[in-house]
Amino acid sequence: MAASPLIDSNQLELMYDSQPLWDGATLAVGYKYLHADANDEQVERANHDYVDGQTAMVVLKQQIFDKGVNNTVIQYYGKGSALQGVTFGAADTLNGTVKEGEGWALRNYGTIPVAADWDVSHALNYAAANDVELWNGDKGDASTASVSAKVTYHWSDYTRTYLEMGYFDDKKTVNGTDYDRSGAKYTLAQALSYGRDKPELRVFVSHYDSDRDNWTDASESSFNNGLDNDTWAVGIQANVFW
């Protein structure tokens, strides 16, 4: 189900963070209400009303060993925010196409140092949206599941190698018709950094494959304008912070 365009909103956010639980564990609880406040251009473009949205989350953070961490997140999305979980949209944005619905997401991610020079990172995601109705009249449900893992070897404090793998599977029902797509990504990268943390300069090669033949949007049909189901990418990526 479509998840754009985004519209302006006024927001109220409540957050209680870093509540200690047991050794190395903290809990955060948050709620955000988004009041639709579309500008003139957005109102003209849509020619319909907009509904407010709301999101809530619970985050359990667990420290593992000295430098490892694991995060478990449960999220709820209501009304205009109903599709944000399945589209990996930000909780502070409001989807102007949604009239009704609700969604939820369960996510787990973290990094564990398994040896002096080896780290393993992971991310598990499942999200669903139910009883969704769009302003264009479409009705249905959607879900997404994904898993990814990254193994890092530190050759020194200034250089490291990454091996990353990921897989996703999306499903949706629109007006009684079922659709699905899936895909995978594999990446090998070599990074130079100032110390073991970012910033870093990364040279990478990635292979993507995806099966989107049974999907609704022809513009999203795999690669090379829909002619191929896989592709390669080579590039340079910089991660910096101040």
Segments from the language model and where they lie:
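Internal, well-ordered domain-core segments that constitute the primary functional module
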Residues: 1-17
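Residues that flank catalytic or metal-binding motifs in active/ligand-binding sites
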Residues: 8-12, 54, 186, 234
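A broad, low-specificity signal marking well-ordered, structured residues that form hydrophobic/aromatic
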Residues: 14, 70, 188, 201, ...
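Detector for outer-membrane/organellar transmembrane beta-barrel domains
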Residues: 17-19, 23-36, 41, 45-175, ...
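Outer-membrane beta-barrel "beta-signal"
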Residues: 225-242
